[in-house]
UniProtKB/Swiss-Prot annotation:
Quaternary state and interactors: Homodimer.
This protein's pathway: Amino-sugar metabolism; N-acetylneuraminate degradation; D-fructose 6-phosphate from N-acetylneuraminate: step 2/5
GO biological process, any: N-acetylneuraminate catabolic process
Gene Ontology MF terms in the entry: ATP binding; N-acylmannosamine kinase activity; zinc ion binding
HAMAP family on file: ManNAc_kinase
Name this protein carries in UniProt: N-acetylmannosamine kinase
InterPro entries (alphabetical): ATPase_NBD, ManNAc_kinase_bac, ROK, ROK_cs
Entry keyword annotation includes ATP-binding: yes
Amino acid sequence: MTTLAIDIGGTKLAAALIDNNLRISQRRELPTPASKTPDALREALKALVEPLRAEARQVAIASTGIIQEGMLLALNPHNLGGLLHFPLIQTLETIAGLPTLAVNDAQAAAWAEYHALPDDIRDMVFITVSTGVGGGVVCDGKLLTGKGGLAGHLGHTLADPHGPVCGCGRVGCVEAIASGRGMAAAARDDLAGCDAKTLFIRAGEGHQQARHLVSQSAQVIARMIADVKATTDCQCVVIGGSVGLAEGYLEQVRAFLMQEPAPYHVALNAARYRHDAGLLGAALLAQGDTL
């Protein structure tokens, strides 16, 4: 059965047709509407989906935010702008005329990355470090989403009780410090206003403040992974996202993790599917894998 998979992110929308063998075809991308209004997103999704829907039998969505009873919610409402409470499933069912499933994008990516691991791995955690920090947890071969869709939102665990205020309302969340946005917000002096990509470039050039910001992010993620190991006893952790997959970053996380006591050590892998993980994970769920 061919699935029309859609990935809704903060900066881009992606869609593709995916068959039962996880072959991707006719992949398309559009920028996420800057206005972040319901009408703008509805029109963008219609333009994205229209050329593909005739060949599909179902729709699977991986989206930023929390999916609750078909509605789009978020721990950090500022991330969604005017899209809070957007009727995501109903909108796509109307546009495509097909049965529709929706799941958080990091949870979907976790499910895809889990299927790329050896069969003896039954417990794993996926962490994406990008504009924000998200995650997904697979326990005994089952994806955990939680009744309210909150499971795996690891970026909103505590890193520093005296740290910056997070958009979710807590103080010192992992996301507020270790994410691309958090790193950029902490940049000062000649780095003020730089995005995470620029910070990595400057760090590679030896800029001391940039190197500190990257190192601080990696250390915070490593400590979070130690907490995750203690909580889930996972067999491995897979790291993805634009920051997580940046050159040299995973090696720094691994080095900091090795400074933790041995019981908190866990194998770290780079994400295999990269920008297609959300699409593939959502398709897998729609094609018969259950939540």
